[in-house]
């Protein structure tokens, strides 16, 4: 425990907040252009080819973004919307692409959890 004299000389430091998605600059989403679309392999216990894109954002930052859902139509120079949210088994991937907005099409034939993949309500 610090003495009163010590606290007068140097007050207690409030813990600083560190963003999990700093490239968004406190915005909910950001627009960007795909510079490279490729697949990446996950960390040790898992095995897959995860679809990711390197995106240059409007604030000139380059980030790696995960493309969720089955199949996608993204290629180089596609304009995408990026939201925060990391992928646990892909190191360095701290952002997700928003499906169903700008150039990223929604997932076709998606029945459940449609809002997360930009899929329209099916005609029943």
From Swiss-Prot:
Gene3D superfamilies: Nucleic acid-binding proteins (2.40.50.140). The modification 3-methylthioaspartic acid is found at residue 89. InterPro entries: NA-bd_OB-fold, Ribosomal_uS12, Ribosomal_uS12_bac. GO terms for molecular function: rRNA binding; structural constituent of ribosome; tRNA binding. Residues 1-25 are annotated as: Disordered. GO terms for cellular component: small ribosomal subunit. The keyword S-adenosyl-L-methionine does not apply. Keywords: Methylation, Ribonucleoprotein, Ribosomal protein, RNA-binding, rRNA-binding, tRNA-binding. GO terms for biological process: translation. Pfam families: Ribosom_S12_S23 (PF00164). The keyword rRNA-binding applies. It comes from the Bacteria. HAMAP family: Ribosomal_uS12_B. Part of the 30S ribosomal subunit. Contacts proteins S8 and S17. May interact with IF1 in the 30S initiation complex. PANTHER family: 30S RIBOSOMAL PROTEIN S12 FAMILY MEMBER (PTHR11652). With S4 and S5 plays an important role in translational accuracy. NCBIfam families: rpsL_bact (TIGR00981). Belongs to the universal ribosomal protein uS12 family. This is Small ribosomal subunit protein uS12.
């Amino acid at each position: 425990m610090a003495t009163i004299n010590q606290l007068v000389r140097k007050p207690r430091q409030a813990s600083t907040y560190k963003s999990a998605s700093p490239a968004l600059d406190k915005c909910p989403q950001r627009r960007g252009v795909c510079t490279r679309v490729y697949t990446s392999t996950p960390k040790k216990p898992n095995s897959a080819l995860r679809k990711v894109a390197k995106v240059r954002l409007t604030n000139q930052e380059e980030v790696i973004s995960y493309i969720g859902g089955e199949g996608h139509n993204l290629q180089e120079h596609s304009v995408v919307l990026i939201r925060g949210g990391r992928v646990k088994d892909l190191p360095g991937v701290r952002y997700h692409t928003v499906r169903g907005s700008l150039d990223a099409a929604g997932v076709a034939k998606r029945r459940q959890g449609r809002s997360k993949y930009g899929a329209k309500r099916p005609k029943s």
